[in-house]
């Protein structure tokens, strides 16, 4: 069961879309961060984050920089990451998956596509 999802994206519109999309998950809290550095602050403040939705192209600390640092933190190893980005370059997809992401969804995406991936990752 998903209780807390951290969405990391520099677009307020995307955060609103996630909020609407994630309303289907009962008792699930959406935590928003505008870049990778802010995401680390949220991870330190919020316990029990179950999933991270991560954009690639962001200011301050991009998604791949975040993933590189994230994978070095033992405390976060159990939190799955789904990359959701307009960055559709094959090398970014491969790099993100090699860095530990559990999935990659290209924007724009269908809600059913993201839902299926979340369900697959959230299922024991």
Predicted feature descriptions by range:
Residues 2-13, 18-22, 52:
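Conserved acidic segment of CheY-like receiver
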Residues 87-88:
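Short, conserved "switch-loop" micro-motifs in signal-transduction and mechanochemical regulators
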Residues 58:
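Receiver (REC) domain active-site loop signature in two-component systems and cognate sites
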Residues 32-51:
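Acidic, metal-coordinating helix/loop segments flanking the phosphotransfer/catalytic sites
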Residues 109-119:
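C-terminal output helix
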